């Protein structure tokens, strides 16, 4: 018996696929139904990791399966290639971002090809290719012309050492994530996209995405944050500050709690706060301290609540005899609503934390059902549930929603404000003070202002002759690139030196894949054919930003006439991460798994260093990461076990939407399965054998094989790859129960049929092994071109049926009967069932109704 050797087999079949160009996408008019499967394209870090293996193996299963079903499959690959890591490499290693990026792409391309994925590499591109980002610049200018792109001064996080703007998530404890410098708040002129113009469409469009995970749709809905509430103004008690004669405008989603107001709060960046700070050093200091804190919403939410009493007071809009203090508070966001709130501590946790700290009143106005208004109080947690309004004059007795409506009506009737819809979503700031990004294609002219670069001068390409020996943006100090002439007046002008947020690059790449040679940004005919993507696969960490921006840009490009679809991804699957135990030595230093030896005695596991024998601490199971060294190199696994074993393991150990824990024992189990599988193919003798279904062993094997088709098909369709693999494992036992050695002609015929089916069913999971097995069986051509097997309904049908039994309409048990059993036989079995007999005790059976192979209804009294 020939031993299966993946080191020889796997490269051989990858070469055969490449030579035959089997994965090249067919023409859009070739008559086959289309199927577009796409995994989120990778950043070219230089090496693939096990997360990549899982992600792309899943996509490959779908692509190969659909191809076998007769679909014209588009399964492309590209590179999300702009971004900070390349600039960091330039600064730290003295290499050019361009060279570093393309070297990494070359390395990762070979690694991904070694995975055996069925990608049409002829459509490959990187977002740093001038051909790609030139097309991006072209549609950007169209959006600029339409007014969807604009500039405005905005408050940003400025790193004074790296001399660049940081996203909120890059500010850690008030310091730059890379430099460690204290971050400053500055106002800079930035470029924005009006994503808020599409807020309603983006929320409403979520209802059409029935093949998206509910949690992702909910995350996007919450991120957009459409809320209906009240916008109104507090009048100042006494003289109003400059420019505030008309009052202090606030927005609230809880007008029902107005009578529970304890104070009014404004953001540290609010114009009133800045006005007061100009004349008050203490307020200046307080605002400066607020700016040192974290700037992400999560950090602001969890930070200690801090405030400063301005000394100003405002009048309650529904009862002017009540006045409220105005505080500057660090938890209020300037870019939500108006940057000012009224605070009702009894019914908002942040307000309550603040009120407790500064000894401000807590006035409950929503009474939970069943509580006594005379004794109800609020403790450590604010009450945010339903109830009846009390302590609120004319609102008393109303439920929350009715009270909201009444409060809005009263405010509107008094011309003090109006009901309003507000969004948490802000316009998308796309300016980045970076070199390694897509240049913004505009020119600044003193005479003409902002002038778009003419389309025939695109792409505006990045200059190669830049240095990274100084902090800041190299484009800003380039001796020639920055300086140009105005396309409008011919005078001296300067190029825009900001580059675009890399989320722009990934917001439309799926559309470019439809026709990578199109002269327009998007080949309309091809895009109309291929879009939307039928199945998109990627990590849930991209649930909000990337997916939201892609949905927005798709709608914007549709409005430009470049696309015909509103939603880019019809189906979305978010796979879990690949995890591994993390290990430390006694000094607290992370240790790689390859340097750890683990022994198990009973339920106790201990670890030591493989080389030194020193004790090792076994830590938690965590996402594989370089920082914790709990990574397993895919190439090492491929070398030791073969690619197919690695592919099989990442899809077999847990449901694909959950994390999978990498273990050596797990991949060894997959390796053993591939060898057992091969042995079944290798042991089958050549020849034509006649079927004989009177042979019970042969018939049982045929039935198992045809049932397997349905199981595996359903598992792929439902993204339950682990269930499909489990069925393949089970079927191997059925094959072993009918060995070739000494078998009858009927069993050999059944085995030949079963192995023919099996080779095609395992092909999406273990494609190299499947090709070798197909060739060993004498299959026509390659298995990659073979059609998906179709089950014989007679053979795939269950021999038995489980029938529920109802007595007078209530389920009282179930019985097993042969499929198609006569009614009288079913009745006899049902009435003899002990559970049924117990429920019929003392009753007379009047009628038994048998619904063939489905249910038994008994009428008795």
UniProtKB/Swiss-Prot annotation:
Q: What is this protein called?
A: Leucine--tRNA ligase
Gene3D superfamilies from the entry? 2.20.28.290, 3.10.20.590, HUPs, Isoleucyl-tRNA Synthetase, Domain 1, Valyl/Leucyl/Isoleucyl-tRNA synthetase, editing domain
Q: Which UniProt keywords apply?
A: Aminoacyl-tRNA synthetase, ATP-binding, Cytoplasm, Ligase, Nucleotide-binding, Protein biosynthesis
Q: What main location does UniProt list?
A: cytoplasm
UniProt-annotated binding residues for ATP: 626
Q: Which GO terms describe its biological process?
A: leucyl-tRNA aminoacylation
- Residue ranges for motif 'HIGH' region? 42-52
Substrates-to-products reaction catalysed: tRNA(Leu) + L-leucine + ATP = L-leucyl-tRNA(Leu) + AMP + diphosphate
């Amino acid at each position: 018996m020939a031993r299966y050797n993946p080191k020889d087999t796997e490269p051989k079949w990858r070469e055969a696929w490449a030579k035959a160009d089997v994965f090249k996408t067919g023409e859009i008019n070739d008559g086959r139904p289309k199927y577009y499967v796409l995994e989120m394209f990778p950043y070219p870090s230089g090496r693939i990791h096990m997360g990549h293996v899982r992600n792309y193996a899943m996509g490959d299963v779908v692509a190969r399966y659909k191809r076998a079903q007769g679909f014209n499959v588009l399964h492309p690959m590209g590179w999300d290639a702009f971004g900070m890591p390349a600039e960091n490499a330039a600064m730290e290693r003295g290499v050019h971002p361009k060279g570093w990026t393309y070297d990494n792409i070359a390395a990762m391309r070979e690694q991904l090809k070694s995975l055996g994925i069925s990608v049409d590499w002829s459509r490959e591109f990187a977002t740093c290719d001038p051909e790609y980002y030139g097309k991006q610049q072209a549609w950007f200018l169209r959006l600029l012309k339409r007014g969807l792109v604009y500039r405005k001064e905005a408050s940003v996080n400025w790193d004074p050492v790296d001399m660049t703007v940081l996203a909120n998530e890059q500010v850690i404890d008030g310091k730059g994530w890379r430099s460690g410098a204290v971050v400053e708040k500055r106002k800079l002129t930035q470029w924005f996209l009006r994503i808020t113009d599409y807020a309603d469409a983006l929320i409403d469009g979520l209802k059409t995405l029935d093949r998206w995970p509910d949690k992702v749709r909910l995350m996007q809905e919450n991120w957009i944050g459409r809320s209906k509430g009240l916008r109104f103004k507090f009048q100042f008690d006494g003289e109003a500050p400059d420019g505030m004669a008309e009052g202090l405008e606030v927005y609230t989603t809880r007008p029902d709690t107005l009578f529970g107001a304890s104070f009014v709060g404004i953001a540290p960046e609010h114009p009133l706060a800045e006005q007061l700070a100009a004349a008050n050093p203490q307020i200046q200091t307080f605002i400066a301290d607020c700016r040192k804190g974290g700037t992400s919403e999560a950090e602001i939410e969890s930070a200690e609540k801090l405030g400063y009493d301005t000394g100003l007071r405002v009048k309650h809009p529904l009862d002017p005899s009540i006045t409220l203090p105005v505080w500057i508070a660090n938890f209020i966001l300037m870019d939500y609503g108006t940057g000012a709130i009224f605070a009702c501590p009894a019914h908002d946790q942040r307000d309550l934390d603040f009120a407790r700290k500064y000894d401000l009143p807590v006035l409950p106005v929503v009474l939970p059902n069943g509580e006594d208004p005379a004794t109800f109080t609020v403790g450590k947690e604010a009450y945010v549930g339903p109830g009846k309004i009390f302590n609120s004059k004319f609102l008393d007795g109303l439920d929350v929603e009715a009270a909201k409506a009444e409060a809005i009506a009263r405010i509107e009737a008094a011309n003090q404000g109006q009901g309003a819809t507000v969004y948490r979503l802000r316009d998308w700031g796309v300016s980045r003070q970076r070199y390694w990004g897509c240049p913004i294609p505009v020119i600044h002219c003193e005479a003409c202002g902002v002038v778009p670069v003419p389309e025939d001068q695109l792409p505006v390409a990045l200059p190669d002759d830049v240095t990274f020996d100084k902090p800041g943006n190299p484009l800003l100090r380039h001796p020639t690139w920055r300086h140009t002439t105005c396309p409008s007046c011919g005078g001296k002008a300067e190029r825009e030196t900001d580059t675009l947020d890399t989320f722009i690059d990934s917001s439309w790449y799926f559309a470019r894949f439809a026709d990578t040679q199109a002269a327009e940004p998007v080949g309309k005919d091809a895009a109309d054919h291929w879009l939307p993507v039928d199945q998109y696969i990627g990590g849930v960490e991209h649930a909000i930003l990337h997916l939201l921006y892609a949905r927005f840009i798709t709608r914007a490009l549709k409005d430009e006439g470049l696309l015909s679809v509103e939603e880019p991804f019809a189906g979305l699957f978010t796979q879990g991460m690949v995890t591994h135990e993390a290990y430390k030595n006694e000094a607290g230093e992370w240790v790689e798994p390859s340097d750890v030896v683990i022994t198990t005695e009973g339920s106790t596991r201990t670890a030591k260093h493989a080389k030194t024998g020193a004790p090792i601490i076994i830590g938690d199971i965590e996402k594989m990461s370089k920082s914790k060294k709990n990574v397993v190199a895919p190439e090492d696994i491929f070398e030791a076990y073969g690619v197919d074993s690695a592919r099989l393991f990442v899809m077999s150990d847990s449901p694909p939407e959950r994390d999978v824990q990498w273990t050596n024992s797990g991949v060894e189990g997959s390796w053993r399965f591939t060898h057992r599988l091969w042995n079944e193919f290798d042991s089958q003798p050549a020849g034509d054998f006649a079927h004989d279904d009177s042979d019970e062993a042969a018939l049982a094997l045929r039935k198992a094989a045809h049932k397997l088709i349905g199981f595996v098909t359903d598992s792929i369709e439902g993204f339950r790859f682990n269930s499909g693999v489990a069925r393949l494992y089970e079927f191997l036992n059925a094959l072993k129960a009918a060995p070739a050695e000494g078998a009858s002609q009927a069993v050999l015929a059944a085995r030949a049929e079963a192995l023919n089916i099996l080779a095609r069913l395992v092909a999406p999971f273990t494609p190299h092994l499947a090709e070798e097995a197909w060739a060993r069986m004498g299959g026509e051509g390659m298995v990659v071109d073979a059609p998906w097997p179709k089950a014989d309904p007679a053979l795939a049908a269950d021999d038995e049926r489980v029938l529920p039994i109802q007595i007078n309409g209530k389920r009282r048990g179930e019985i097993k009967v042969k499929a198609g059993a006569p009614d009288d036989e079913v009745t006899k079995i049902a009435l003899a069932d002990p559970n049924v007999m117990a429920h019929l005790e003392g009753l007379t059976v009047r009628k038994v109704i048998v619904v063939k192979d489905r249910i038994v209804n008994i009428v008795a009294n």
